[in-house]
């Protein structure tokens, strides 16, 4: 099972433009940092790669998540929580998640 998952992840990341700056840096020798790496940080913000959604699940419900590009969050509609994505890396710590249902409840009360 782990082999299959690793193979699928590898295939997803090998698609054109799939390797982000973070992934490319991870593939280099550990500890090797260059001046070019520092310039990359200033030039391009890191973005989340949607191909990773097939491997990510909510740590609380173990259900799939959906990516909302407008808020840059991974959302669990069932529980009404959203995990932030910071520099292209999802913060999947439950304490870091925000609730989304409060907004829905406020909108419903305003309509009535």
UniProtKB/Swiss-Prot annotation:
Presequence boundaries: 1-34
GO cellular component: endoplasmic reticulum membrane; mitochondrion
Domain TRM112: 49-95
UniProt source species: Rattus norvegicus
Name of the molecule in the record: Protein preY, mitochondrial
GO biological process: protein stabilization
Signal sequence coordinates: none
Localization per Swiss-Prot or TrEMBL: Mitochondrion
Pfam families per record: Trm112p
Assembly with partners or alone: Interacts (via TRM112 domain) with NDUFAF5; the interaction is direct and stabilizes NDUFAF5 protein. Interacts with COQ5; the interaction is direct, stabilizes COQ5 protein and associates PYURF with COQ enzyme complex.
Similarity comment: Belongs to the PREY family.
Role according to the record: In mitochondria, S-adenosylmethionine-dependent methyltransferase chaperone that supports both coenzyme Q biosynthesis, by stabilizing its components, such as COQ5, and NADH:ubiquinone oxidoreductase complex (complex I, MT-ND1) assembly, by stabilizing complex I assembly factors, such as NDUFAF5.
Keywords, in A-Z order: Mitochondrion, Transit peptide
């Amino acid at each position: 099972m782990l082999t299959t998952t690793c193979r699928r992840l590898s295939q997803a990341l090998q698609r054109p433009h799939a390797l982000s700056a973070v992934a490319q840096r991870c593939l280099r020798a550990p500890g090797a940092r260059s001046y070019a790496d520092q310039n990359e940080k200033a030039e391009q913000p890191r973005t989340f790669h949607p191909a990773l959604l097939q491997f990510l699940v909510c740590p609380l419900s173990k259900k799939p998540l959906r990516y909302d590009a407008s808020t840059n969050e991974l959302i669990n509609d069932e529980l009404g929580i959203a995990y932030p994505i910071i520099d292209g890396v999802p913060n999947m710590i439950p304490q870091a998640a925000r609730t989304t249902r409060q907004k829905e409840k406020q909108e419903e009360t305003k309509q009535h």
